[in-house]
Amino acid sequence: MIALSIAGFDNSGGAGTLADIRTFKHFGIYGVAVITALAVQNTQKVYEVFPIPPDVVKEELKAIFEDFPIKGVKIGMLANKEIAEVVYETLKSKKTNFIVLDPVFRSKSGRELLSEEGVEFLKSEFIKIVDLITPNVPEAEILCGEEIKSLEDVKNCAQKIYSLGAKSVLIKGGHLKGNYAIDILYDGKSFYEFKAPKIAGKTPRGTGCVYSSAILANYLRHKDLIKAIKTAKDFITEAIKNSKKLGKGYEIMDF
């Protein structure tokens, strides 16, 4: 099976399309990519972000869909509204089994990675073609417009994000206080909880990229979202635990 990563290119390899495709491969899925931006970065910080011209992104998408039977799509960094619109218009007309959106608003070092106009377009239109959206707590706060301090807040926010049009919402709770990272899935009917201990002293980059890609890969394998998230949760927990300090800054998950 073939999955498509639509995301930024991180030249340090810790996040973005390189991390997505490594994750796909780990689970036996062949990965192809459409690059939305070049992020000049290392393990310490993002130095600069160069969005790919929207017309080029459109041609990348055309080349992939003309040739490959894409079974699932994972979307990460979109950079700006113009790129988001190109991706939206293309995916709206294609038949894929599953679309996962891991909304990327800021880098781990605090750099803006999606314009305000892009965020508004994501909320008003883009989210409607998404099967699963996987924000962390800060991203979820932007999407639902409310502060999140507890699991009850997470559930309320998940319902609000669902009402924007996503078919299911997974809010990652790693930013909340406590010894456990508790993620909440809402599918419009029920809430599901996925829990794992936080790994002290480990703060690798690319966790959102790898987690969402692992969910997509396992959904394509089993067609069971609950099972896919559970498998991905176990995998990301081990990947964080085994992450390595390859540079001078944040760890990298080397699996």
UniProtKB/Swiss-Prot annotation:
Catalyzed chemical reaction(s): 4-amino-5-hydroxymethyl-2-methylpyrimidine + ATP = 4-amino-2-methyl-5-(phosphooxymethyl)pyrimidine + ADP + H(+); 4-amino-2-methyl-5-(phosphooxymethyl)pyrimidine + ATP = 4-amino-2-methyl-5-(diphosphooxymethyl)pyrimidine + ADP
Binding-site residues for 4-amino-5-hydroxymethyl-2-methylpyrimidine, renumbered to this chain: 41
Principal EC category: transferase
Source organism superkingdom: Bacteria
The keyword Chaperone appears for this protein: no
CDD domains in the cross-refs: HMPP_kinase (cd01169)
One GO location term (cellular component): cytosol
Protein name: Hydroxymethylpyrimidine/phosphomethylpyrimidine kinase
One annotated GO molecular function: phosphomethylpyrimidine kinase activity
EC number: 2.7.1.49, 2.7.4.7
Pfam (any one): Phos_pyr_kin
Protein's GO biological process: thiamine biosynthetic process; thiamine diphosphate biosynthetic process
Keyword line: ATP-binding, Kinase, Nucleotide-binding, Thiamine biosynthesis, Transferase
Disulphide-bonded residues: none
Listed pathway(s): Cofactor biosynthesis; thiamine diphosphate biosynthesis; 4-amino-2-methyl-5-diphosphomethylpyrimidine from 5-amino-1-(5-phospho-D-ribosyl)imidazole: step 2/3; Cofactor biosynthesis; thiamine diphosphate biosynthesis; 4-amino-2-methyl-5-diphosphomethylpyrimidine from 5-amino-1-(5-phospho-D-ribosyl)imidazole: step 3/3
Role according to the record: Catalyzes the phosphorylation of hydroxymethylpyrimidine phosphate (HMP-P) to HMP-PP, and of HMP to HMP-P.
Membership in a protein family: Belongs to the ThiD family.
